Amino acid sequence: MTIPKKAKVVIIGGGVIGCSIAYHLGKIGWKDVVLLERKQLTCGTTWHAAGLIAQLRATKNMTRLAKYSQELYQKLEKETGLSTGFKRNGSITVALTNERMEELKRSAGMARAFGVEIDE
């Protein structure tokens, strides 16, 4: 593949962030975008990450971003025809002390306030 001599946007790094930027620019109609990766897409740090997407975060905006990411990964395979390997899993947290139980109850309340699906 020949690399263009110039582009409106040049993204260096084909990890999850670089690919996301290229994807979202393409979704809003940008055509003059080049993504540079020295090896294969997502073969660096992204490849070695656990790939867990817990929805509840410390702030509402970060929780919204995590929820959006999970929803996007669920639909990418259908949209692109490429397998993502994404599997939606839940999690279980156990409290061994009363203090930890109170902390989990506060987290559950925050999760509900942020629109995160939760079972107690």
Which residues does each predicted region cover?
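Short, flexible hinge/linker loops that cap or flank conserved catalytic cores
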Residues: M1-P4, K27, F86
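Beta1/beta-strand and adjacent pyrophosphate-binding region of the FAD-binding site
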Residues: I3-I17, V34
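A secondary-structure boundary/capping signal
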Residues: I12, E37, A49, R88-G90
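Hydrophobic alpha-helical packing residues
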Residues: L25-G26, A111
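Glycine-rich FAD pyrophosphate-binding loop
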Residues: G26-W47
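Dinucleotide-binding Rossmann-like beta1-alpha1 core, especially the glycine-rich loop
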Residues: G51-E120
